[in-house]
């Protein structure tokens, strides 16, 4: 199972995922979402719309971490990624679990 943690505090965003989903389709779905978000935020940073504080990936451990700040467009990208992960959690609860920081409850 992949355990994700989502936190938003104003214009600061954190998404971390740990562990393997145990299902190839679920893993591919999550990978697409988190890498799309990371790519968007990286591009936003080059255009001075975001700043990445931490970015880590470890395929062997199934680890992803992205901590950043940004404008309303990066916020929309973050929220879209979280919605995608929530959809997967509803459809395949044995593959992913999401915990939320206080600002997200």
What are these regions (language model features)?
Residues 1-25, 34-105:
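N-terminal intrinsically disordered, cationic/polar leader segments
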